[in-house]
Amino acid sequence: MSWPLIGAYALLAFVAIIALNVTYQFLFRLLNKTRPPLVFHWIPFIGSTIHYGMDPYGFFFSCREKYGDIFTFILLGRPTTVYLGTQGNEFILNGKLKDVNAEEVYSPLTTPVFGSDVVYDCPNSKLIEQKKFIKFGLSQTALEAHVPLIEKEVEDYLAMSPNFHGTSGEVDITAAMAEITIFTAGSALQGEEVRSKLTTEFAVLYHDLDKGFTPINFMLPWAPLPHNKKRDAAHARMRAIYIDIINKRRNAGDNVPEKLDMIGNLMQCTYKNGQPLPDKEIAHIMITLLMAGQHSSSSISSWIMLRLASQPAVVEELYQEQLANLERTGPNNSLAPLQYKDFDNLPLHQNVIRETLRLNSSIHSLMRKVKNPLPVPGTPYVIPTSHVLLSAPGVTALSDEYFPNAMAWDPHRWETQAPKENDKDDIVDYGYGAISKGTSSPYLPFGAGRHRCIGEKFAYLNLAVIVATMVRHLRFSNLDGQTGVPATDYSSLFSGPMKPARIRWERRAAKSG
Protein backbone atom coordinates (compact mmCIF):
# COMPACT_ATOMS: atom_id res chain seq x y z
CA MET A 1 0.00 0.00 0.00
CA SER A 2 1.44 3.38 -1.02
CA TRP A 3 2.06 6.20 1.43
CA PRO A 4 -0.45 8.53 -0.30
CA LEU A 5 -3.13 5.86 0.13
CA ILE A 6 -2.22 5.38 3.79
CA GLY A 7 -2.44 9.13 4.26
CA ALA A 8 -5.86 9.22 2.61
CA TYR A 9 -7.17 6.45 4.87
CA ALA A 10 -5.75 8.17 7.93
CA LEU A 11 -7.44 11.42 6.95
CA LEU A 12 -10.75 9.65 6.39
CA ALA A 13 -10.43 7.92 9.77
CA PHE A 14 -9.71 11.24 11.46
CA VAL A 15 -12.73 12.87 9.81
CA ALA A 16 -14.89 9.89 10.80
CA ILE A 17 -13.75 10.15 14.42
CA ILE A 18 -14.60 13.84 14.51
CA ALA A 19 -17.99 13.16 12.90
CA LEU A 20 -18.78 10.46 15.44
CA ASN A 21 -17.68 12.73 18.27
CA VAL A 22 -19.90 15.58 17.06
CA THR A 23 -22.83 13.17 16.59
CA TYR A 24 -22.37 11.84 20.11
CA GLN A 25 -22.41 15.36 21.53
CA PHE A 26 -25.58 16.20 19.58
CA LEU A 27 -27.34 13.09 20.87
CA PHE A 28 -26.02 13.68 24.40
CA ARG A 29 -27.46 17.19 24.39
CA LEU A 30 -30.77 15.93 22.98
CA LEU A 31 -31.28 12.88 25.17
CA ASN A 32 -29.37 13.63 28.37
CA LYS A 33 -31.51 14.48 31.37
CA THR A 34 -29.29 13.87 34.39
CA ARG A 35 -25.78 14.97 33.34
CA PRO A 36 -24.51 18.55 33.21
CA PRO A 37 -24.23 20.04 29.70
CA LEU A 38 -21.10 18.99 27.80
CA VAL A 39 -18.89 21.75 26.38
CA PHE A 40 -18.74 21.34 22.61
CA HIS A 41 -15.40 20.17 21.23
CA TRP A 42 -14.18 18.82 17.88
CA ILE A 43 -11.42 16.40 18.81
CA PRO A 44 -11.95 13.48 21.24
CA PHE A 45 -9.55 13.16 24.17
CA ILE A 46 -8.15 16.67 23.58
CA GLY A 47 -11.59 18.15 24.17
CA SER A 48 -11.32 21.65 25.65
CA THR A 49 -7.83 21.10 27.05
CA ILE A 50 -6.13 23.77 24.93
CA HIS A 51 -8.66 26.54 25.63
CA TYR A 52 -8.72 25.72 29.33
CA GLY A 53 -4.94 25.46 29.56
CA MET A 54 -4.22 28.74 27.80
CA ASP A 55 -6.83 30.88 29.55
CA PRO A 56 -8.71 29.07 32.33
CA TYR A 57 -10.69 32.07 33.53
CA GLY A 58 -11.64 33.08 30.01
CA PHE A 59 -12.77 29.49 29.50
CA PHE A 60 -14.80 29.44 32.73
CA PHE A 61 -16.57 32.73 32.03
CA SER A 62 -17.38 31.90 28.41
CA CYS A 63 -18.75 28.49 29.40
CA ARG A 64 -20.81 30.01 32.18
CA GLU A 65 -22.48 32.31 29.65
CA LYS A 66 -23.39 29.34 27.44
CA TYR A 67 -24.13 26.59 29.94
CA GLY A 68 -24.62 28.15 33.37
CA ASP A 69 -22.66 27.44 36.54
CA ILE A 70 -22.52 23.66 36.01
CA PHE A 71 -20.97 22.08 32.92
CA THR A 72 -18.63 19.28 31.91
CA PHE A 73 -15.62 19.52 29.61
CA ILE A 74 -13.08 17.00 28.39
CA LEU A 75 -9.59 17.47 29.87
CA LEU A 76 -7.12 15.07 28.28
CA GLY A 77 -9.80 12.41 27.94
CA ARG A 78 -11.16 12.92 31.45
CA PRO A 79 -14.74 14.22 31.90
CA THR A 80 -14.32 17.18 34.24
CA THR A 81 -17.41 18.75 35.77
CA VAL A 82 -17.11 22.40 36.77
CA TYR A 83 -19.46 23.91 39.34
CA LEU A 84 -18.93 27.67 39.66
CA GLY A 85 -20.12 30.11 42.30
CA THR A 86 -20.31 29.89 46.07
CA GLN A 87 -22.72 26.95 45.87
CA GLY A 88 -20.25 25.12 43.65
CA ASN A 89 -17.42 25.80 46.08
CA GLU A 90 -19.54 24.41 48.91
CA PHE A 91 -20.57 21.33 46.91
CA ILE A 92 -17.03 20.40 45.87
CA LEU A 93 -14.70 21.69 48.57
CA ASN A 94 -16.90 20.59 51.46
CA GLY A 95 -17.84 17.27 49.91
CA LYS A 96 -17.78 14.24 52.19
CA LEU A 97 -14.69 12.03 52.18
CA LYS A 98 -16.70 9.07 50.97
CA ASP A 99 -17.94 11.08 47.98
CA VAL A 100 -14.98 13.13 46.77
CA ASN A 101 -11.26 12.47 46.91
CA ALA A 102 -8.31 14.80 46.37
CA GLU A 103 -5.62 12.15 46.77
CA GLU A 104 -6.44 10.32 43.53
CA VAL A 105 -6.15 13.54 41.55
CA TYR A 106 -3.00 15.00 43.06
CA SER A 107 -0.96 12.09 44.44
CA PRO A 108 0.59 11.02 41.10
CA LEU A 109 1.90 14.56 40.66
CA THR A 110 2.90 15.48 44.20
CA THR A 111 4.26 12.25 45.69
CA PRO A 112 7.45 12.15 43.55
CA VAL A 113 8.13 15.76 44.60
CA PHE A 114 7.04 15.82 48.25
CA GLY A 115 7.80 12.19 49.12
CA SER A 116 5.92 9.17 50.42
CA ASP A 117 3.60 8.94 53.43
CA VAL A 118 2.76 12.65 53.53
CA VAL A 119 0.08 14.95 52.11
CA TYR A 120 -1.72 13.04 49.34
CA ASP A 121 0.25 9.79 49.75
CA CYS A 122 -1.41 8.80 53.00
CA PRO A 123 -4.92 8.30 54.41
CA ASN A 124 -6.79 11.53 55.06
CA SER A 125 -6.81 10.81 58.80
CA LYS A 126 -3.00 10.80 58.78
CA LEU A 127 -2.87 13.98 56.71
CA ILE A 128 -5.12 15.67 59.27
CA GLU A 129 -2.63 14.77 62.03
CA GLN A 130 0.26 16.10 59.94
CA LYS A 131 -1.60 19.36 59.39
CA LYS A 132 -2.11 19.59 63.13
CA PHE A 133 1.64 19.17 63.66
CA ILE A 134 2.36 21.95 61.19
CA LYS A 135 -0.30 24.24 62.60
CA PHE A 136 1.20 24.12 66.08
CA GLY A 137 4.55 24.96 64.51
CA LEU A 138 2.91 28.20 63.34
CA SER A 139 1.94 29.34 66.82
CA GLN A 140 1.54 32.98 67.78
CA THR A 141 4.94 32.90 69.49
CA ALA A 142 6.59 31.44 66.40
CA LEU A 143 4.95 33.99 64.09
CA GLU A 144 6.13 36.85 66.29
CA ALA A 145 9.67 35.46 66.16
CA HIS A 146 9.51 35.22 62.36
CA VAL A 147 9.07 38.97 61.79
CA PRO A 148 12.68 40.10 62.47
CA LEU A 149 14.03 37.11 60.52
CA ILE A 150 11.97 37.97 57.45
CA GLU A 151 12.79 41.68 57.70
CA LYS A 152 16.51 40.93 57.92
CA GLU A 153 16.40 38.66 54.88
CA VAL A 154 14.74 41.37 52.78
CA GLU A 155 17.10 44.10 53.98
CA ASP A 156 20.16 41.91 53.35
CA TYR A 157 18.90 41.10 49.86
CA LEU A 158 18.28 44.76 48.99
CA ALA A 159 21.74 45.63 50.30
CA MET A 160 23.74 42.84 48.64
CA SER A 161 21.90 41.55 45.58
CA PRO A 162 23.16 42.69 42.16
CA ASN A 163 19.49 43.20 41.30
CA PHE A 164 19.45 46.27 43.54
CA HIS A 165 22.96 47.63 43.11
CA GLY A 166 23.24 51.40 43.28
CA THR A 167 20.56 54.01 43.91
CA SER A 168 18.18 53.15 41.06
CA GLY A 169 17.73 50.71 38.24
CA GLU A 170 15.55 48.09 36.61
CA VAL A 171 14.85 44.58 37.86
CA ASP A 172 13.10 41.43 36.71
CA ILE A 173 10.87 41.43 39.75
CA THR A 174 9.72 37.83 39.29
CA ALA A 175 13.29 36.57 39.58
CA ALA A 176 14.02 38.84 42.55
CA MET A 177 10.90 37.86 44.47
CA ALA A 178 11.54 34.16 43.84
CA GLU A 179 14.88 34.58 45.61
CA ILE A 180 13.56 36.78 48.41
CA THR A 181 10.65 34.49 49.27
CA ILE A 182 12.75 31.34 49.36
CA PHE A 183 15.19 33.13 51.68
CA THR A 184 12.44 34.41 53.99
CA ALA A 185 10.69 31.04 54.17
CA GLY A 186 14.03 29.33 54.64
CA SER A 187 15.04 31.56 57.50
CA ALA A 188 11.67 31.57 59.27
CA LEU A 189 10.41 28.02 58.75
CA GLN A 190 13.23 25.80 57.60
CA GLY A 191 15.90 26.61 60.16
CA GLU A 192 19.40 28.06 59.99
CA GLU A 193 20.95 24.85 58.65
CA VAL A 194 18.70 24.86 55.58
CA ARG A 195 18.94 28.64 55.17
CA SER A 196 22.74 28.37 54.97
CA LYS A 197 22.39 26.02 51.99
CA LEU A 198 19.85 28.01 49.99
CA THR A 199 22.41 29.91 47.96
CA THR A 200 24.36 26.82 46.94
CA GLU A 201 23.29 23.20 46.57
CA PHE A 202 19.70 23.73 47.70
CA ALA A 203 19.04 26.22 44.90
CA VAL A 204 19.89 23.59 42.28
CA LEU A 205 17.89 20.90 44.08
CA TYR A 206 14.89 23.21 44.37
CA HIS A 207 15.01 23.96 40.66
CA ASP A 208 15.17 20.28 39.71
CA LEU A 209 12.36 19.36 42.11
CA ASP A 210 10.25 22.21 40.81
CA LYS A 211 10.35 20.71 37.33
CA GLY A 212 8.32 17.84 38.76
CA PHE A 213 5.29 20.14 38.63
CA THR A 214 5.40 20.24 34.82
CA PRO A 215 1.81 19.80 33.51
CA ILE A 216 2.74 16.66 31.53
CA ASN A 217 3.33 14.94 34.87
CA PHE A 218 -0.41 14.88 35.50
CA MET A 219 -0.45 12.23 32.77
CA LEU A 220 3.05 10.74 32.96
CA PRO A 221 4.44 11.30 36.48
CA TRP A 222 6.68 8.22 36.40
CA ALA A 223 7.84 8.47 32.79
CA PRO A 224 11.66 8.20 32.45
CA LEU A 225 11.93 11.73 31.08
CA PRO A 226 15.05 13.83 31.78
CA HIS A 227 13.21 16.27 34.06
CA ASN A 228 11.73 13.38 36.06
CA LYS A 229 15.14 11.77 36.54
CA LYS A 230 16.47 15.08 37.87
CA ARG A 231 13.37 15.42 40.06
CA ASP A 232 13.91 12.01 41.65
CA ALA A 233 17.63 12.60 42.23
CA ALA A 234 16.91 16.02 43.75
CA HIS A 235 14.26 14.58 46.06
CA ALA A 236 16.61 11.85 47.33
CA ARG A 237 19.39 14.35 47.97
CA MET A 238 17.13 16.90 49.66
CA ARG A 239 15.64 14.22 51.91
CA ALA A 240 19.16 13.12 52.90
CA ILE A 241 20.07 16.71 53.80
CA TYR A 242 17.04 17.07 56.07
CA ILE A 243 17.63 13.71 57.74
CA ASP A 244 21.25 14.69 58.36
CA ILE A 245 20.08 17.93 60.01
CA ILE A 246 17.62 15.99 62.17
CA ASN A 247 20.27 13.46 63.20
CA LYS A 248 22.73 16.20 64.15
CA ARG A 249 20.11 17.92 66.29
CA ARG A 250 19.18 14.66 68.01
CA ASN A 251 22.82 13.81 68.67
CA ALA A 252 23.45 17.27 70.09
CA GLY A 253 20.70 16.66 72.65
CA ASP A 254 20.65 19.25 75.42
CA ASN A 255 23.63 21.02 73.89
CA VAL A 256 21.46 22.62 71.20
CA PRO A 257 19.03 25.38 72.25
CA GLU A 258 15.31 24.87 71.71
CA LYS A 259 14.38 26.16 68.28
CA LEU A 260 11.16 27.80 67.12
CA ASP A 261 11.57 26.57 63.56
CA MET A 262 9.42 23.87 62.00
CA ILE A 263 12.02 21.09 62.15
CA GLY A 264 12.33 21.56 65.90
CA ASN A 265 8.55 21.43 66.22
CA LEU A 266 8.12 18.30 64.11
CA MET A 267 10.86 16.45 66.00
CA GLN A 268 8.65 16.63 69.09
CA CYS A 269 5.47 15.37 67.39
CA THR A 270 3.77 12.00 67.94
CA TYR A 271 0.82 10.43 66.12
CA LYS A 272 -2.32 9.50 68.07
CA ASN A 273 -1.26 5.83 68.01
CA GLY A 274 1.87 6.72 69.97
CA GLN A 275 4.29 6.52 67.04
CA PRO A 276 6.78 9.40 66.91
CA LEU A 277 6.80 11.22 63.60
CA PRO A 278 9.50 9.33 61.62
CA ASP A 279 12.51 11.28 60.43
CA LYS A 280 11.70 10.39 56.82
CA GLU A 281 8.25 11.94 57.18
CA ILE A 282 9.71 15.02 58.87
CA ALA A 283 11.99 15.42 55.86
CA HIS A 284 9.10 14.98 53.44
CA ILE A 285 6.91 17.48 55.31
CA MET A 286 9.75 20.00 55.21
CA ILE A 287 10.14 19.46 51.46
CA THR A 288 6.39 19.98 51.09
CA LEU A 289 6.52 23.25 53.04
CA LEU A 290 9.44 24.48 50.96
CA MET A 291 7.94 23.58 47.58
CA ALA A 292 4.23 24.27 48.10
CA GLY A 293 4.60 27.52 50.00
CA GLN A 294 7.32 28.96 47.81
CA HIS A 295 5.26 28.90 44.62
CA SER A 296 2.35 30.91 45.95
CA SER A 297 4.53 33.35 47.92
CA SER A 298 6.83 34.01 44.98
CA SER A 299 3.94 34.53 42.59
CA ILE A 300 1.81 36.77 44.77
CA SER A 301 4.74 38.90 45.97
CA SER A 302 5.72 39.45 42.34
CA TRP A 303 2.17 40.50 41.51
CA ILE A 304 2.12 42.88 44.48
CA MET A 305 5.28 44.63 43.31
CA LEU A 306 3.99 44.78 39.73
CA ARG A 307 0.70 46.26 40.92
CA LEU A 308 2.52 48.81 43.05
CA ALA A 309 4.78 49.75 40.13
CA SER A 310 1.69 50.33 38.00
CA GLN A 311 0.29 52.68 40.70
CA PRO A 312 3.25 54.44 42.37
CA ALA A 313 0.87 56.61 44.40
CA VAL A 314 -0.11 53.52 46.40
CA VAL A 315 3.58 52.90 47.20
CA GLU A 316 3.72 56.33 48.80
CA GLU A 317 0.45 55.72 50.64
CA LEU A 318 1.97 52.58 52.14
CA TYR A 319 5.10 54.44 53.20
CA GLN A 320 3.11 57.27 54.74
CA GLU A 321 0.95 54.74 56.59
CA GLN A 322 4.09 53.41 58.27
CA LEU A 323 5.35 56.88 59.12
CA ALA A 324 2.00 57.81 60.64
CA ASN A 325 1.38 54.66 62.65
CA LEU A 326 4.70 53.06 63.62
CA GLU A 327 7.38 54.04 66.10
CA ARG A 328 10.32 56.08 64.80
CA THR A 329 13.03 55.10 67.24
CA GLY A 330 15.70 54.12 64.74
CA PRO A 331 18.82 56.11 63.83
CA ASN A 332 18.04 59.69 62.74
CA ASN A 333 14.39 59.27 63.77
CA SER A 334 13.92 56.49 61.24
CA LEU A 335 11.30 53.76 61.51
CA ALA A 336 11.94 51.13 64.17
CA PRO A 337 12.37 47.47 63.21
CA LEU A 338 9.08 45.79 62.43
CA GLN A 339 7.17 43.83 65.05
CA TYR A 340 4.22 41.47 64.73
CA LYS A 341 1.88 43.90 66.48
CA ASP A 342 2.68 46.65 63.96
CA PHE A 343 0.53 45.11 61.26
CA ASP A 344 -2.65 45.76 63.25
CA ASN A 345 -1.91 49.43 62.53
CA LEU A 346 -1.22 48.98 58.80
CA PRO A 347 -4.61 48.26 57.21
CA LEU A 348 -3.59 49.42 53.74
CA HIS A 349 -0.69 46.95 53.74
CA GLN A 350 -3.17 44.17 54.50
CA ASN A 351 -5.58 45.42 51.85
CA VAL A 352 -2.88 45.53 49.17
CA ILE A 353 -2.14 41.86 49.86
CA ARG A 354 -5.84 40.97 50.03
CA GLU A 355 -6.67 42.73 46.75
CA THR A 356 -3.73 41.19 44.91
CA LEU A 357 -4.70 37.73 46.12
CA ARG A 358 -8.22 38.39 44.82
CA LEU A 359 -7.02 39.20 41.30
CA ASN A 360 -3.94 37.02 40.99
CA SER A 361 -4.35 33.75 42.85
CA SER A 362 -1.69 31.27 41.71
CA ILE A 363 -4.04 28.25 41.69
CA HIS A 364 -7.08 28.59 39.44
CA SER A 365 -8.54 25.07 39.75
CA LEU A 366 -9.15 22.72 42.69
CA MET A 367 -10.05 19.16 41.69
CA ARG A 368 -11.67 16.17 43.38
CA LYS A 369 -12.32 12.65 42.07
CA VAL A 370 -15.95 11.53 42.36
CA LYS A 371 -16.21 8.32 44.40
CA ASN A 372 -20.01 7.91 44.56
CA PRO A 373 -22.75 9.22 42.22
CA LEU A 374 -23.42 12.75 43.44
CA PRO A 375 -26.83 14.40 43.06
CA VAL A 376 -26.46 18.18 42.73
CA PRO A 377 -29.00 19.85 45.06
CA GLY A 378 -31.61 21.94 43.27
CA THR A 379 -30.83 20.45 39.85
CA PRO A 380 -31.68 17.25 37.95
CA TYR A 381 -27.97 16.46 37.63
CA VAL A 382 -26.16 13.44 39.06
CA ILE A 383 -22.36 13.46 38.69
CA PRO A 384 -21.07 9.93 37.88
CA THR A 385 -17.96 8.31 39.32
CA SER A 386 -16.17 8.60 35.97
CA HIS A 387 -15.95 12.37 36.45
CA VAL A 388 -13.56 14.71 38.22
CA LEU A 389 -15.07 17.76 39.93
CA LEU A 390 -13.45 21.17 39.47
CA SER A 391 -13.96 24.17 41.71
CA ALA A 392 -12.71 27.60 40.60
CA PRO A 393 -12.97 29.96 43.61
CA GLY A 394 -11.26 32.70 41.61
CA VAL A 395 -14.34 33.07 39.42
CA THR A 396 -16.41 34.62 42.21
CA ALA A 397 -13.45 36.79 43.20
CA LEU A 398 -13.36 38.16 39.64
CA SER A 399 -17.13 38.66 39.33
CA ASP A 400 -18.79 42.09 39.40
CA GLU A 401 -21.65 40.42 41.24
CA TYR A 402 -19.50 40.30 44.36
CA PHE A 403 -16.80 42.90 43.66
CA PRO A 404 -17.93 45.98 41.69
CA ASN A 405 -15.55 46.75 38.83
CA ALA A 406 -13.94 43.43 39.70
CA MET A 407 -11.09 43.52 37.19
CA ALA A 408 -9.70 46.78 38.62
CA TRP A 409 -6.96 46.55 41.26
CA ASP A 410 -8.22 48.77 44.06
CA PRO A 411 -6.93 47.98 47.56
CA HIS A 412 -9.16 50.71 48.98
CA ARG A 413 -12.27 48.66 48.12
CA TRP A 414 -11.59 46.60 51.26
CA GLU A 415 -12.11 49.66 53.47
CA THR A 416 -15.85 49.30 52.83
CA GLN A 417 -16.01 45.68 51.64
CA ALA A 418 -14.50 43.73 54.50
CA PRO A 419 -14.16 39.95 54.15
CA LYS A 420 -17.30 38.15 55.28
CA GLU A 421 -17.15 37.34 58.97
CA ASN A 422 -17.52 33.69 59.85
CA ASP A 423 -20.70 32.71 61.63
CA LYS A 424 -21.03 29.80 64.02
CA ASP A 425 -22.50 27.55 61.34
CA ASP A 426 -19.41 28.10 59.20
CA ILE A 427 -16.93 26.84 61.81
CA VAL A 428 -15.80 23.23 61.60
CA ASP A 429 -13.02 21.12 63.09
CA TYR A 430 -11.54 18.57 60.66
CA GLY A 431 -9.16 17.32 63.34
CA TYR A 432 -6.48 20.02 63.41
CA GLY A 433 -8.39 22.80 65.17
CA ALA A 434 -11.52 24.85 64.52
CA ILE A 435 -11.42 26.75 61.24
CA SER A 436 -13.88 28.37 58.89
CA LYS A 437 -15.19 26.17 56.10
CA GLY A 438 -14.99 29.37 54.09
CA THR A 439 -17.02 28.07 51.18
CA SER A 440 -19.86 30.58 51.58
CA SER A 441 -17.48 33.45 50.84
CA PRO A 442 -16.79 34.66 47.27
CA TYR A 443 -13.19 35.30 48.35
CA LEU A 444 -11.18 32.09 48.90
CA PRO A 445 -7.51 32.79 48.11
CA PHE A 446 -6.37 29.89 50.30
CA GLY A 447 -9.04 27.39 49.34
CA ALA A 448 -11.72 26.04 51.67
CA GLY A 449 -12.90 22.93 53.41
CA ARG A 450 -10.70 20.18 54.81
CA HIS A 451 -7.90 20.95 52.33
CA ARG A 452 -7.77 24.68 53.06
CA CYS A 453 -4.19 25.94 53.28
CA ILE A 454 -3.06 25.89 56.90
CA GLY A 455 -0.13 28.20 56.18
CA GLU A 456 -2.46 31.15 55.58
CA LYS A 457 -1.35 33.15 58.64
CA PHE A 458 2.32 32.71 57.82
CA ALA A 459 1.70 33.59 54.17
CA TYR A 460 -0.02 36.86 55.09
CA LEU A 461 2.70 37.70 57.61
CA ASN A 462 5.52 36.86 55.21
CA LEU A 463 3.99 39.00 52.46
CA ALA A 464 3.23 41.87 54.86
CA VAL A 465 6.80 42.02 56.18
CA ILE A 466 8.24 41.80 52.67
CA VAL A 467 5.99 44.59 51.37
CA ALA A 468 6.55 46.84 54.39
CA THR A 469 10.33 46.41 54.25
CA MET A 470 10.62 46.99 50.51
CA VAL A 471 8.39 50.08 50.67
CA ARG A 472 10.62 51.51 53.42
CA HIS A 473 13.65 51.31 51.19
CA LEU A 474 12.39 51.64 47.62
CA ARG A 475 9.99 53.37 45.27
CA PHE A 476 8.60 51.45 42.30
CA SER A 477 7.27 52.43 38.89
CA ASN A 478 6.69 50.92 35.48
CA LEU A 479 9.25 51.27 32.74
CA ASP A 480 8.70 54.11 30.28
CA GLY A 481 5.97 53.26 27.82
CA GLN A 482 4.50 50.48 29.94
CA THR A 483 1.10 50.58 31.58
CA GLY A 484 -0.73 48.15 33.81
CA VAL A 485 0.76 44.75 34.64
CA PRO A 486 1.92 41.78 32.53
CA ALA A 487 -0.45 39.07 31.40
CA THR A 488 -0.76 35.88 33.42
CA ASP A 489 1.29 32.85 32.42
CA TYR A 490 -0.86 29.73 32.73
CA SER A 491 1.67 27.33 31.19
CA SER A 492 2.71 26.08 34.64
CA LEU A 493 0.49 24.39 37.20
CA PHE A 494 1.10 27.47 39.36
CA SER A 495 0.22 30.60 37.41
CA GLY A 496 2.21 33.81 37.71
CA PRO A 497 3.24 36.89 35.73
CA MET A 498 4.62 36.47 32.25
CA LYS A 499 8.41 36.56 32.44
CA PRO A 500 10.51 38.60 32.37
CA ALA A 501 8.51 41.26 34.22
CA ARG A 502 10.73 44.31 34.61
CA ILE A 503 10.01 47.38 36.71
CA ARG A 504 11.97 50.44 37.78
CA TRP A 505 13.13 50.94 41.37
CA GLU A 506 14.70 53.85 43.23
CA ARG A 507 16.11 53.98 46.74
CA ARG A 508 14.66 56.43 49.21
CA ALA A 509 17.12 59.09 50.35
CA ALA A 510 16.33 58.35 53.99
CA LYS A 511 14.10 55.89 55.81
CA SER A 512 12.47 58.66 57.74
CA GLY A 513 11.14 60.16 54.52
Swiss-Prot record:
The chain crosses the membrane at residues 3-23. It catalyses: a 14alpha-methyl steroid + 3 reduced [NADPH--hemoprotein reductase] + 3 O2 = a Delta(14) steroid + formate + 3 oxidized [NADPH--hemoprotein reductase] + 4 H2O + 4 H(+); a 14alpha-methyl steroid + reduced [NADPH--hemoprotein reductase] + O2 = a 14alpha-hydroxymethyl steroid + oxidized [NADPH--hemoprotein reductase] + H2O + H(+); a 14alpha-hydroxymethyl steroid + reduced [NADPH--hemoprotein reductase] + O2 = a 14alpha-formyl steroid + oxidized [NADPH--hemoprotein reductase] + 2 H2O + H(+); a 14alpha-formyl steroid + reduced [NADPH--hemoprotein reductase] + O2 = a Delta(14) steroid + formate + oxidized [NADPH--hemoprotein reductase] + H2O + 2 H(+). Heme binds at residue 453. CDD domains: CYP51-like (cd11042). It is found in: Membrane. Its cofactor is heme. Pfam families: p450 (PF00067). GO terms for biological process: sterol biosynthetic process. GO terms for molecular function: heme binding; iron ion binding; monooxygenase activity; oxidoreductase activity, acting on paired donors, with incorporation or reduction of molecular oxygen. Its EC number is 1.14.14.154. It comes from the Eukaryota. PROSITE patterns: CYTOCHROME_P450. The keyword Heme applies. GO terms for cellular component: membrane. Pathway: Steroid biosynthesis; sterol biosynthesis. Disulfide bonds: none annotated. Keywords: Heme, Iron, Lipid biosynthesis, Lipid metabolism, Membrane, Metal-binding, Monooxygenase, Oxidoreductase, Steroid biosynthesis, Steroid metabolism, Sterol biosynthesis, Sterol metabolism, Transmembrane, Transmembrane helix. Sterol 14-alpha demethylase; part of the gene cluster that mediates the biosynthesis of the tetrahydropyranyl antifungal agent restricticin that acts as an inhibitor of CYP51 and blocks the ergosterol biosynthesis. Sterol 14-alpha-demethylase plays a critical role in the biosynthesis of ergosterol, the major sterol component in fungal membranes that participates in a variety of functions. Rtsn2 acts as a self-resistant CYP51 that contains mutations found in CYP51s isolated from azole resistance strains and that is not inhibited by the final product of the cluster, restricticin. PANTHER family: 24-HYDROXYCHOLESTEROL 7-ALPHA-HYDROXYLASE (PTHR24304:SF2), CYTOCHROME P450 FAMILY 7 (PTHR24304). Belongs to the cytochrome P450 family. This is Sterol 14-alpha demethylase rstn2.
